[in-house]
Amino acid sequence: MSEYASSIHSQMKQFDTKYSGNRILQQLENKTNLPKSYLVAGLGFAYLLLIFINVGGVGEILSNFAGFVLPAYLSLVALKTPTSTDDTQLLTYWIVFSFLSVIEFWSKAILYLIPFYWFLKTVFLIYIALPQTGGARMIYQKIVAPLTDRYILRDVSKTEKDEIRASVNEASKATGASVH
């Protein structure tokens, strides 16, 4: 247990060091006499608690906001990078996010069947949004690819698929354009 606590303490110290130049967090730290990491963790906990309790039905908008902000930022950053290493992660995320948005048309029925749906959705979206967890890669490999591969290039043999992929990758390297 002490390993776990020391790991969290170390990460919080790293957070405080990394954001020591942030003016807003510095002002909050000066006013409250609490480290930046405690403030951010407390605000994150309060945010998740509001989603969990779903007072006045705000859980839906807070969940969607949390599920949009970080992936949107990462997507904008990915558009500026020449490599396509992060594209599968982000595209998988947006596929799952869109699928959940379509399902939520029946949100009253979902909330009846799954009482803490917005909280569970938020935790799940954060899990697949963070590249460190590998959640989107796992979802892609276990669910998305097996369901969609049979419809994409379904009339093409494996050899032809490999040739197509190789020529696309070759063209990508020659032109410097990224392949998605």
Curated annotation (Swiss-Prot):
Complex formation: Oligomer. Interacts with YIP1.
Lineage: Eukaryota, Fungi, Dikarya, Ascomycota, Saccharomycotina
Cytoplasmic-side segments: 2-35, 79-88, 128-180
GO cellular component entries: cell periphery; cellular bud; cellular bud tip; endoplasmic reticulum; endoplasmic reticulum membrane; endoplasmic reticulum tubular network; Golgi membrane; membrane
Sites of N-acetylserine modification: 2
UniProt name for this protein: Protein YOP1
UniProt keyword Endoplasmic reticulum, yes or no: yes
Domain of life of the native organism: Eukaryota
Span list, region Interaction with YIP1: 2-17
Biological role: Required to generate and maintain the structure of the tubular endoplasmic reticulum network and the vacuole. Induces high curvature in membranes and causes membrane tubule formation. Involved in membrane/vesicle trafficking.
Record topology, Lumenal segments: 56-57, 106-108
Source organism: Saccharomyces cerevisiae (strain ATCC 204508 / S288c) (Baker's yeast)
Subcellular location, record wording: Endoplasmic reticulum membrane; Golgi apparatus membrane
Keywords: Acetylation, Endoplasmic reticulum, Golgi apparatus, Membrane, Transmembrane, Transmembrane helix
